[in-house]
Regions:
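Short, surface-exposed polybasic-aromatic patches that bind anionic ligands, especially phosphate groups
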Residues: 1
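A Trp-anchored, charged/polar loop motif used as the substrate-binding/catalytic surface
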Residues: 4
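Acidic, carboxylate-rich catalytic segments that either coordinate divalent cations
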Residues: 112-178
C-alpha cells in the first residue's frame, strides 16, 4: 500500500504523502486487538473486544494513547513542528476513522480530505486484488480461466491475460505513446 501511495503522490500534489503513509501504517492497527490470534496458528478466532468495539475504534484509541505519551515528553522539540502536532493527530485520526469509505461499511465518518479518500481507495484496491489472487488459488475452476465467485467480488472470477511481452523478433512498444 505504501508503494501505491508513493507512486500516486507525484500525480496529486495536494496529497500530504507523509500523512498518507502514517495513515497506511495505522489504519488497521486496531486489528491487532480486534482479532484473537491463537498460538497454534494463524487463525482469527472471535474476540469480545473486537466484536464490541471494532478495529477502527481500537485504532483511534491507540493513536490517542501514543499521542498522550508523546505529549508527556518534557522535550519541546516535537511541539514546534509544522504543521502543528495537534493538527497532525486530528488528521491521522480522520484517516483511521474514514478508511472504510462510508458509514454503511463501518467508518464513523466519510473521507473529507484528499489523504483520507486516497487511503480508502488504496486499501480497497489492495483488498480486492488480494481477493482475486487468493480466489485463483482456492476457487473452483469452472472453465478455462473462469472460477467460481469469491465473495464480496461481483460475479465469477476470470483470470487475467498473461503480461504482454514483445517476441524476440519484434521491437519494444513505443513508450512515447503512453
Amino acid at each position: 500500500m505504501m508503494r501505491v501511495a508513493r507512486a500516486i503522490a507525484p500525480l496529486y500534489p495536494q496529497l500530504n504523502v507523509d500523512l498518507l503513509i502514517a495513515g497506511i501504517l495505522f489504519h488497521d492497527s486496531g486489528k491487532l486487538w480486534e482479532n484473537h490470534y491463537a498460538e497454534s496458528g494463524f487463525v482469527m478466532d472471535y474476540d469480545e473486544r473486537g466484536e464490541l468495539i471494532g478495529h477502527i475504534s481500537i485504532g483511534l484509541e491507540l493513536v490517542n494513547s501514543l499521542w498522550r505519551k508523546i505529549s508527556a515528553d518534557k522535550s519541546d522539540a516535537w511541539k514546534n513542528l509544522t504543521p502543528p502536532s495537534e493538527d497532525v493527530r486530528l488528521h491521522l485520526l480522520h484517516l483511521i476513522g474514514a478508511h472504510h469509505g462510508e458509514q454503511q461499511f463501518g467508518s464513523p465518518v466519510d473521507p473529507k480530505t484528499p489523504e483520507a479518500m486516497a487511503l480508502h481507495y488504496i486499501d480497497n484496491l489492495d483488498a480486492r486484488l488480494e481477493m482475486f489472487a487468493a480466489g485463483y488459488l482456492t476457487a473452483k475452476p469452472l472453465a478455462n480461466r473462469i472460477f467460481e465467485r469469491v465473495w464480496p467480488l461481483p460475479g465469477k472470477l476470470v483470470k487475467s491475460l498473461e503480461i504482454f511481452r514483445a517476441s524476440a523478433s519484434e521491437s519494444k512498444p513505443n513508450d512515447q505513446l503512453l
